[in-house]
Amino acid sequence: DHCLGLVLDALDASPHKDNTIVVLFSDHGFHLGEKQRWARRTSWEDGDRVALIVAAPGYKSGNKTNKPAQLLDIFPTLLELADLPRDNQQEGHSLVPLLMNSQAEWPHVSLSSFGKGNYAVRSEHFRYISYLDGSEEFYDHRDDSHEWNNQVGNKKYVQEIAAHRKYLPVRSEDVLPGNSTGHKAYDAASRLLKE
C-alpha cells in the first residue's frame, strides 16, 4: 500500500495527473481453510474474485459496484477511455458504463475455469459451478455470500440455473496435458477432497 501511495503521489505531483488512467487489479483470492480448502484451486467466490480499481480523468472516484466483471474487460475499457476504436474480436466488455454509474444495468457475467471441464458463471446475484464429473453447485449471493448452501436441487432456482448453464463452453480441452496442478480435486457431492 505504501509503495502504491508513493506512485500515486508522484503522479499527482506530475503534469500527467489529468491525462493518466490508473488500473489496479490483483491475482485471484485465496482460501484459508474454508470448506476444507487451502490456497485457491476452486471456482468458489473466495478463490475466483479479484480486486479491480479503475481511476480515470473525468470520472467520479469512490464509486463501488458488485456487478460481475472479468480481467478481459480491462482492455476494452482502456480503449474506450482513450477514445480508441474497439476491436470487434475482443471477448470483454467496456466497464465505462459502470464508471459513469456503478448501478447501471449490466447484463454481463464473469466466466472462469479451473482445471479441465470445471467452470463457474458469476452473475450479479448468483454463482453457478459445473464440474467435469457432472456435478453442479448454485449459490444465491443475496443471502449466502459465503456459498455454504448449494441450491442446485432447489426448484425455486430452476430458471436461473438453466440461464447460467447457457454460458458454459460447448467443449473443453486440456491447455496442458494431464492435471497441471498436481492437487487433489474437490468432490461437490461429498464436499470432500479426492485423489
Where are these predicted regions, by residue range?
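Secondary-structure boundary motif
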Residues: 13-16, 104, 153
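Aromatic- and histidine-enriched alpha-helix N-cap/loop-to-helix transition segments
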Residues: 2, 69-70
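Alpha-helical packing segments of well-folded alpha/beta enzyme cores
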Residues: 2-7, 164, 168
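C-terminal cap/loop subdomain of S1 sulfatases and analogous C-terminal strand-loop tails that border
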Residues: 28-34, 60, 72-146, 159-160, ...
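Short, solvent-exposed loop/turn segments at secondary-structure boundaries
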Residues: 63-67, 85, 152-153
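Histidine-centered active-site microenvironments of extracellular/periplasmic hydrolases
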Residues: 9-63, 70
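Active-site-proximal N-terminal segment of extracellular/periplasmic enzymes that hydrolyze or transfer
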Residues: 149-157
